[in-house]
């Protein structure tokens, strides 16, 4: 199958593409294995570790790279398209998760991490940095340019943000505590602002990733592709 002319490397393929996707899939799978042996109150709580946006993002990353591995092994264009469709949202989401996590942690780790939930550096990097790195490399090196417009990303991100808020409140109604201590400090109005702001960040992240892609792979051509919002993500 011929790669998109703006792709830096051939994908799907059984060479570099397969190597990157296998490494990413192994990293994400290890993170989930870690959760199954990490004994905390979350392990027996309602919602398990899926109360954390980090784990929801990690799930999307795992799905994208599993599809990527299958596409590389079978050279399937359909699986390659499916991987790209998941990655279009998973990649900017993971970038935002990394920025918010490390930024807030630098300011005050107690806003994110309750007592007894402190991670060692290696798993911490695995959850809060590796997914963003792997997915960004997949985009820049192994994917065609995104053609999804910013308003679509904003709409989808807003729906996901408020669906996550509903999910967090549902878990709180069963468990009596929030996954992030920060939520305890916010009023309802402040939470609305937080989740709206987060959806906006995902949109900005998507636009920035498109800009980086254009700079690396061909600015003018990528800009023309970005103005074809109805074109399928290949």
Functional labels for PLM-detected ranges:
Residues 11-16, 51, 175-210:
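Membrane-interface transmembrane-helix boundary segments in multi-pass integral membrane proteins
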Residues 121-133, 193-196:
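Membrane-interface loop-to-helix entry segments
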Residues 1-9, 220-234:
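Non-transmembrane, juxtamembrane loop and terminal tail segments
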Residues 3-105, 109-113:
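N-terminal helical submodule of small eukaryotic multi-pass membrane proteins
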Residues 159-177:
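Juxtamembrane non-transmembrane "cap" segments at the membrane-aqueous interface
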Residues 44-52, 81-85, 111-124, 148-153, ...:
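Non-cytosolic membrane-interface motifs at loop->transmembrane helix junctions
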Residues 69-74, 204-225:
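Transmembrane-helix exit/juxtamembrane "anchor" motif
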Residues 131-148:
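Alpha-helical transmembrane segments in multipass membrane proteins, preferentially the mid-helix core
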């Amino acid at each position: 199958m011929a790669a998109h002319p703006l792709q830096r490397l051939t994908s799907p393929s059984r060479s570099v593409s397969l190597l990157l996707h296998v490494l990413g899939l192994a990293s994400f799978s290890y993170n989930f294995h870690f959760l199954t042996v990490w004994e905390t109150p979350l392990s027996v709580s309602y919602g398990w570790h899926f109360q954390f946006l980090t784990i929801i993002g990690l799930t999307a990353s795992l799905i994208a790279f599993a599809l990527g591995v299958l596409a590389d092994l079978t050279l399937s264009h359909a699986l390659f398209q499916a991987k790209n469709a998941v990655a279009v949202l998973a990649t900017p989401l993971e970038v935002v998760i990394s920025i918010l996590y490390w930024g807030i942690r630098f300011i005050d780790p107690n806003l994110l991490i309750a007592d007894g939930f402190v991670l060692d550096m290696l798993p911490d990097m695995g959850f809060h940095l590796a997914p963003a790195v792997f997915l960004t490399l997949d985009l820049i090196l192994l994917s065609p340019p995104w053609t999804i417009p910013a308003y679509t990303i904003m709409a989808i991100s807003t729906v996901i943000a408020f669906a996550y808020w509903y999910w967090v409140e549902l878990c709180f109604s069963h468990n009596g505590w929030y996954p992030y201590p920060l939520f305890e400090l916010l009023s309802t109005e402040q939470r609305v602002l937080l989740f709206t702001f987060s959806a906006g960040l995902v949109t900005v992240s998507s636009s920035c990733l498109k800009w980086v892609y254009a700079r690396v792979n061909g600015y003018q051509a990528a800009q023309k592709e970005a103005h074809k919002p109805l074109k399928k993500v290949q």
